[in-house]
Amino acid sequence: MRVFVTGASGWIGSAVVPELIRAGHDVVGLARSDGAAEAIAARGAEVLRGDLNDLDVLRTGAADSDGVIHLAFVVPSVSEAATRADAEAIDTFAAALADSGKPLVVSGGTLSTPGRVTTERDELVAAGPIAARITNMKAALASADRGVRSILVMLPRSVHGAGERHGFIPQLIAVARAKGVSGYIGDGSTRWPAVDVKDAATLYRLALEKAPAGAVLNAVGDEGVAVRDIAEAIGRHLNVPARSLPAEEFEGMLVRLLSTDMPASSAITQHLLGWTPTHPGLIEDIDEGHYFS
């Protein structure tokens, strides 16, 4: 297949592109800068210059492909401008692929269902701080009604691996270095789902190749890792204590993420696609030490 990938030079794209190429697919990666173009080309993919605001470029990339994997997001925060650009990009892809039966694989985030482990069958409810993004996810799934094989890949809070520089684990390490304490909020019992980036890349490929229209897939290796265990693993490597800190010691999304229990299962996904995570879990990955070099 000829696959158009947005976010091809990003953290997840850097694993997805080689995974697709190894499986025999031809990849066209969207690049908004010279650096991104060089990174995409170095991985063996063709480059299409543009960004998520270039709808004509997105339309061309999708129309000339056998499927789209949408990994890009304009900025790392959930801003109105970013979610609007995401919505327009998804609509552009859906229109370009309409009535073709071709796959449109869109990224989301695993849900939080108080008191239990979330699954792929939980309803997408557009509420809370990421309501606009959930609306976009629902729009992507609805493109199945337009003859598109639309699929959601729901990513956990930690997509980890060697080379990660900007995710939540590097942020927690930076806080621990700055404060001399590896911290968590409360008793640290809240849990994060996690997946190795290479396992996530395999799931994106399987989704592209054989997931049915309307599928919601959880890219989860670790169902739930206690944030206290994460803090202790970081503390071991930095030789600092791990203990509870007031919420105000953390910034941005970390406060909500450290305070919210959000375990997630991928049992349905694994059964549907035959996907089995095989790479190290989050604590084992932290203990390998590459985050601290």
Q: Model segments located where?
A:
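A conserved pocket-lining segment of Rossmann-fold NAD(P)-dependent short-chain dehydrogenase/reductase
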Residues: 174-195
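NAD(P)H-binding glycine-rich loop region in Rossmannoid oxidoreductase-like domains
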Residues: 29-91, 95
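Amphipathic terminal alpha-helices
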Residues: 280-293
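Conserved Rossmann-fold NAD(P)-dependent oxidoreductase catalytic core, especially the SDR/UDP-sugar
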Residues: 81, 88-130, 151
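Mid/C-terminal beta-alpha module of Rossmann-like enzyme folds, strongest
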Residues: 2, 182, 203-254
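N-terminal Rossmann NAD(P)H-binding glycine-rich loop of SDR-like oxidoreductase domains
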Residues: 3-25
